[in-house]
Amino acid sequence: MNASPTPTATTTTEPATAVVRCRTRLARRVVAAVGPDGLLPAPCESRVLESALALALLTEERAEADATARLTAYLRTTLRTAPPDPFQCAVARAVLGGAGERGERVGDEGDMDAGTALDAGLDGFDHFTAGRKRLMFRTVLAALGATGFPAVPWEAYDTRPQQSWLHMEMKALKVLAAHGTGHPDVVRDEDWRALLPALEPGPAWECNNLAQLLALLALRHSPRHRPALGDVLKHVAGRLRPDGGMPFIDGMTVFTTAAAGLALSLLPAPPACVTPMADALALRRNPDGGYGFHSGVAQSDVDDTCYVLEFLRRAAPDRHRTAVAEAEGYLLALRNPDGGFPTFARGTSSEIAMTAAAASALAHDPDRREEVDEAVRYVVRHQRPDGTFERSWSRNATNAVFRAVLALTGVAAHGEERRSRARAAERALAHLAATQNGDGGWGHAEAEPSDPISTAYAVIALARGPRARPGGPLDRALAYLVERQHPDGGYRSRPDQAGPRPLLYDVPALADVFVLLALAHATATPDPEGCSR
């Protein structure tokens, strides 16, 4: 059941020398960034949505004048120089207000009304969460006075067992809609209780600024709780980034440390920091055995748990035997009856990328063969005719493809099952070859400009295909990555992470981490221990 990286032609050709040099420089940069606590810092950059909500909150409360000025400047500058998606532009314009702001042209969205901007922002978002996102985004715009509140039953704001911050967000939006439409009586005590963690001092609850800001805006409508906002707003103002904006989340330290540790452990001579990195992650497991995306996040998820599990198993399986077993137990507890895995809660929709990740993470345990086979079958069943898969927490198509290819090729199979998996992997790899840009890279979608992160994901998949031919898709992709390396050894990339989906957010450290993981896969030799990520 090993899932060893497949050696490629890059290990023996002249271009391989450049690739190895590139890998070495990048690895040194990543190692140098690991802190004394064993974690790789991964702060999140400012985003327009949270910055606008923070500005709205501080303005309404007449608090933190310096932070208000900084947020205003950040929003005006960003709308003028680097406008995001139409929805976020509409939110920012609603908060900034004034004829002058509304009259400025903001990219192609400058003349859109809020409703049109919402439609444009969700255009092409084909996902099982699309209905809820439309409700969320429309309610945000309505609460800011940009459009009317959606005419939906109040139950539409209720959530089944979901991630903790989504529960808070939907309760906050319900309160805002109820008070905005003159129906405060529909707000129940349990709705208010769900918002109270937002009043805790210090970092945002669950490191999620979006959830806290929505909750604080809602708590303004509570005579009982509004007086407590003053102290909290000081902490909110203290979380602004150097550019004056507010990030979506505090960071992704657990996620990036696990992925970086996995990449470093694939190198011919793993650096000494790998063991402290594994130790640091093992200490941060949650009571349910899983892991969240950042230190201090109590909500575990399949994505982070899979990365941590694979890294711990490869770097220090005996040393962290308990953590490995508990992570496996967490994953198995979330497995759905259809054989797939959701991101956060059993019973919610299974996702391709999460299912493929779980299959790869569990594949090293022979006692989990049945669950792994079911997960791989789920992946095969849900492949699209063009060879792609539904996107998940990444906006680019290559992310789901690389995770699926690793699952499809990482577990031994026989007979028709083996042929079925091979066909699925071939279709996925053929799609990558057919959609590669002329510069050797890939973008978020076909024909979009190439970027290092999207290309790195594709390289991981291609490295698992048949032995690469010189000058083929893999060699061209590696040449693209070599050429895009900065003098400091690092990378800058268009962000691909989305949350709430499909809104992009930027964690710059991810570019270095995933390019290193790609280069490690592309230059690896067979290893009896195996590694599937």
From Swiss-Prot:
Keywords: Isomerase, Magnesium, Metal-binding, Repeat. It catalyses: (2E,6E)-farnesyl diphosphate = (5S,9S,10S)-drim-7-en-11-yl diphosphate. GO terms for molecular function: isomerase activity; metal ion binding. Mg(2+) 2 binds at E169. Requires a divalent metal cation for activity. The highest activity is observed in the presence of Mg(2+), but the enzyme can also use Ni(2+) and Co(2+) in vitro, while is inactive with Mn(2+) and Zn(2+). Binds a binuclear Mg(2+) cluster coordinated with Glu-169 and the diphosphate moiety of FPP. The keyword Metal-binding applies. Its EC number is 5.4.99.-. InterPro entries: SQ_cyclase_C, Terpenoid_cyclase/PrenylTrfase. (2E,6E)-farnesyl diphosphate binds at R132, K133, Q163, W165, R501. The keyword DNA repair does not apply. Its cofactor is Mg(2+); Ni(2+); Co(2+). Coiled coil: none annotated. PFTB repeats lie at residues 274-316, 324-366, 372-415, 425-466, 474-517. Catalyzes the cyclization of farnesyl diphosphate (FPP) to drimenyl diphosphate. Cannot use geranylgeranyl diphosphate (GGPP) as substrate. Belongs to the terpene cyclase/mutase family. This is Drimenyl diphosphate synthase. It comes from Streptomyces showdoensis.
